[in-house]
Amino acid sequence: MLALDKVRYEYEHEWFEFDLNVADGDIVALMGPSGAGKSTLLSLVAGFIEPVSGSIKVNDQSVLGLAPYQRPFSMLFQEHNLFAHLTVRENIGLGLHPGLKLNAEQKQQVVDAAQQVGIADYLDRLPEQLSGGQRQRVALARCFVQPNPIWLLDEPFSALDPLLREEMLALVKQLASERQRTVVMVTHHLSDARAIASQIAFLSQGKVKVVSDCQAVTAQHPHPELAQFVAAALNEPK
């Protein structure tokens, strides 16, 4: 389980305080208005920034003070996931060894991962030779070859067209289920959350205001801020 307890952080005189529990195997979508603290929460968990106080634990073990690479998380962002000078094969291989010193079994893992995400034909290409969707497939492959039990996704597919986004989300859901991974994903698309998540954590004004079963999140939700947010989201063009 990932557990955040009274995690406080200050940025430009604005305070954030997060409480959130994510059970093993769950997929939780972080949603809320701009500036609510979604990416801040993810950055605190990942270790890119440190809280003023509070605790962040994975299976009752604190991760505070650990560098990002020492924490049990794999991360996927909207962009800047790949090293431009490395091939697809090498970019995926980094998930197994930072120096790319792979044994025969690990080299086969890279090939298998590429096949699972549909990029086996591009293993020796550079990222600049790929489309945006193909680059995100490479990043996803590197994400899941790592042994880390929790994936942190920060709007990884928001720049893709709706059909491709839907395909990538289905792939994440499938791979997470097969590998029994926990997923925490920031998204501003309600449809994305409904496609992949078991729960939605709604953030507003620097706090997690409510955590709700994904299918119960409607414009009639009893929490007024969440209901208003959903109503606005449903009226937005897809």
From Swiss-Prot:
GO MF terms on file? ABC-type thiamine transporter activity; ATP binding; ATP hydrolysis activity
Enzyme type, top EC level: translocase
Q: Keywords, A to Z? A: ATP-binding, Cell inner membrane, Cell membrane, Membrane, Nucleotide-binding, Translocase, Transport
Q: ABC transporter domain location, by residue?
A: 2-230
Q: List the record's Gene Ontology CC terms alphabetically.
A: plasma membrane
Q: Which InterPro entries match?
A: AAA+_ATPase, ABC_SmlMolc_Importer, ABC_transporter-like_ATP-bd, ABC_transporter-like_CS, P-loop_NTPase, Thiamine_ABC_ThiQ
Reactions catalysed: thiamine(out) + ATP + H2O = thiamine(in) + ADP + phosphate + H(+)
Q: What is its EC number?
A: 7.6.2.15
Q: Which Pfam families match?
A: ABC_tran (PF00005)
Q: What is its main location?
A: membrane
Instruction: Give me the residues that bind ATP, please.
Output: G32, P33, S34, G35, A36, G37, K38, S39
Q: Which cysteines are joined by disulfide bonds?
A: none
Please give the start and end residues of each transmembrane region: none
The compartments listed are: Cell inner membrane
Topology relative to the lipid bilayer, per the entry, is:
Peripheral membrane protein
Superkingdom of origin: Bacteria
**Record text on subunit structure and interactions:** The complex is composed of two ATP-binding proteins (ThiQ), two transmembrane proteins (ThiP) and a solute-binding protein (ThiB).
Function noted in UniProt = Part of the ABC transporter complex ThiBPQ involved in thiamine import. Responsible for energy coupling to the transport system.
Indicate the family of this protein. Answer: Belongs to the ABC transporter superfamily. Thiamine importer (TC 3.A.1.19.1) family.
| Protein name from the UniProt record | Thiamine import ATP-binding protein ThiQ
Gene source species: Vibrio cholerae serotype O1 (strain ATCC 39315 / El Tor Inaba N16961)
- What taxonomic classification does the UniProt entry list for its organism? Bacteria, Pseudomonadati, Pseudomonadota, Gammaproteobacteria, Vibrionales
